[in-house]
Design a protein with these regions (language model features):
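Short, amphipathic alpha-helical interaction segments positioned at domain boundaries
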Residues: 378-392
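A short, conserved structural fragment
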Residues: 360-369
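Basic amphipathic alpha-helical segments that dock to polyanions
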Residues: 355-359
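Local cysteine-cluster metal-coordination motifs and their immediate loop/turn environment
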Residues: 28-39
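C-terminal scaffold of the Radical SAM
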Residues: 18-22, 41-62, 68-345
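Minor-groove-contacting beta-hairpin "wing" of winged helix-turn-helix DNA-binding domains
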Residues: 370-374
C-alpha cells in the first residue's frame, strides 16, 4: 500500500468524481472525556464557530469529489449534539448547495443530557431524521465510572423526547464492563426492550491505549472482563433481542425489520463515502483518505485553501482483505463468486483452501456460493476472518 501526504499536493490531485453513497461529518467536541474513548475530540468549545466555518469551506474544496446523489448524512464525533439547530442547518444547507443531496437518512449522534425537550424540538427544523443516543448503561454507577455526563433517568427522558418528536431512534449499549455479571447485563437488555427503539447497537468494551481505562488496568485499579464472560454476554444479547423481534444484521447491531442503519451499512458493503471534518475518513474505489486529526491544524489548512489529507492507495490484497473483513461481520456473509474473478489463481487457491479448513473446524458455514460465520462464533469473528487474509 502507498501512503500519500496530500497537504503539499495541489487540490486537483484528488478531484475525481466518485460515486459516493453518503457523507460523514466529524464533530470533534465533547463536554468531557469518557473513560474508554480514544476518538479524536476536544473538550474545549472555543473553536466551534471557526470549525463550522472551516467545515463549510471544506465542502467547497471537495465539491468535485461527488457526482452521485448523497443519500445518507451522518453527524458523528465527538458529540454532535453540541451543535445548535441553526449550526446544523448551515451545514446541511451548504451540503445541499454543494452536492446532489437526496437524503434517505440523516443521523445525529447525541448524548442524553443534550436531548432536552427544547433541543429535540429545535431539531425538527433541521434535516435530521434519526438520533443515535449514547446511553451506554442504565446504571448510574457505571455511567460515573465511564465519566459520562448523564444519568439513567436522563437516558429514559431523552428517548421519550425523541420518540414523541417523531425521530427514528438508535441507542448504544456497552457490555463486558469490568466485573459485569450476566445478571447485570440481562437487566440492561430488559431495560432496553422496555424502550422498544427501532435500532440498538451493543458494543463490547475494548481496551484502547492512552485512555483512562487503560491507565486503570495498568495500575490494577480495575480488571478487564475475561473473554469467555464477554462472549457469553454477546450471545445473551443475541438470544434476547432476536426473541424480541430484532434482526441481528451485523455483529454489533440489531434492528427491527426495515430499520437497519443505512449509512453504516454502506461501510460494511464498502460503498464509497465522503468524510468531512478533522480525522474524518473517506473511501472511494481503491483509495482511503483521512483528514488531519487536529482541530487547529484542520482549521488553518482549510482557511489556506489546502485539504489536510493523507491517502492510502489500496493494493488488490488490501481490497480483498477489507471485503472479507466487512462482509463476514454481517449476517449476509460473503459471496465468494464476487472474488473469484478478481483474485489471482494463487490467491484463489489459498482462499478456497482456507474456506475448507475453517468449514471443517465449524468456524464458518457455506450455503451455495455464500460463506458466513455462525452466530455462536461471531464474537471471535475478527480472529476467524484474519485467517483468510492475503499477506503476499
Amino acid at each position: 500500500m502507498q501512503i500519500l501526504n496530500l497537504t503539499l499536493y495541489p487540490l486537483s490531485y484528488l478531484c475525481h468524481s466518485f460515486q459516493m453513497a453518503g457523507v460523514y461529518i466529524h464533530i470533534p467536541f465533547c463536554h468531557k472525556a469518557c473513560t474508554y474513548c480514544d476518538f479524536h475530540f476536544s473538550t474545549s468549545l472555543k473553536n466551534k464557530t471557526a470549525f463550522v466555518e472551516a467545515l463549510l469551506r471544506e465542502m467547497e474544496l471537495r465539491k468535485n469529489f461527488v457526482d452521485e446523489p448523497v443519500t445518507t448524512i451522518y453527524f458523528g464525533g465527538g458529540t454532535p449534539s453540541v451543535l445548535q439547530a441553526d449550526e446544523i442547518n448551515r451545514i446541511t444547507e451548504k451540503l445541499t448547495e454543494t452536492f446532489k443531496v437526496m437524503p434517505q437518512e440523516v443521523t445525529l449522534e447525541a448524548n442524553p443530557e443534550d436531548l432536552t425537550e427544547d433541543y429535540v424540538h429545535s431539531l425538527r427544523s433541521t434535516m435530521v431524521n434519526r438520533l443515535s443516543i449514547g446511553i451506554q448503561s442504565f446504571r448510574n454507577e457505571r455511567l460515573q465510572w465511564m465519566n459520562r455526563n448523564h444519568t439513567a433517568e436522563q437516558s429514559l427522558q431523552a428517548v421519550q423526547c425523541a420518540n414523541d418528536a417523531g425521530f427514528d431512534v438508535s441507542i448504544d449499549l456497552i457490555f463486558a464492563l469490568p466485573a459485569m455479571t450476566m445478571q447485570e447485563w440481562q437487566q440492561q437488555l430488559m431495560q432496553a426492550d422496555v424502550l422498544r427503539v427501532p435500532h440498538i447497537s451493543a458494543y463490547s468494551l475494548t481496551l484502547e491505549s492512552k485512555t483512562a481505562y487503560a491507565f486503570q488496568v495498568k495500575k490494577k485499579q480495575v480488571q478487564e472482563l475475561n473473554e469467555l464472560d464477554a462472549e457469553m454476554q454477546f450471545l445473551a444479547a443475541h438470544d434476547f433481542f432476536t426473541e424480541k423481534g430484532y434482526v441481528h444484521y451485523e455483529i454489533s447491531n440489531y434492528s427491527l425489520p426495515g430499520k437497519q442503519a443505512k449509512h453504516n451499512s454502506s461501510y460494511w458493503n464498502r460503498t464509497p463515502y465522503l468524510g468531512l471534518g478533522p480525522s474524518a475518513h473517506s473511501f472511494a474505489k481503491n483509495m482511503r483518505c483521512w483528514n488531519v486529526a487536529n482541530n487547529n491544524s484542520y482549521i488553518q489548512y482549510i482557511s489556506d485553501g489546502v485539504l489536510p489529507l493523507s491517502c492510502e492507495e489500496l493494493q488488490l490484497k488490501d481490497e480483498l482483505n477489507e471485503t472479507m473483513m466487512t462482509a463476514l461481520r454481517t449476517a449476509e456473509g460473503l459471496n465468494i463468486e464476487t472474488l473469484e474473478n478478481i483474485m489471482t489463481p494463487e490467491m484463489y487457491r489459498h482462499f478456497m483452501k482456507e474456506i475448507a479448513l475453517q468449514e471443517k473446524r465449524g468456524w464458518i458455514e457455506r450455503k451455495n456460493a455464500v460463506i458466513f460465520i455462525p452466530i455462536k462464533h461471531w464474537y471471535k469473528a475478527d480472529r476467524i476472518i484474519s485467517e483468510f487474509f492475503i499477506t503476499t
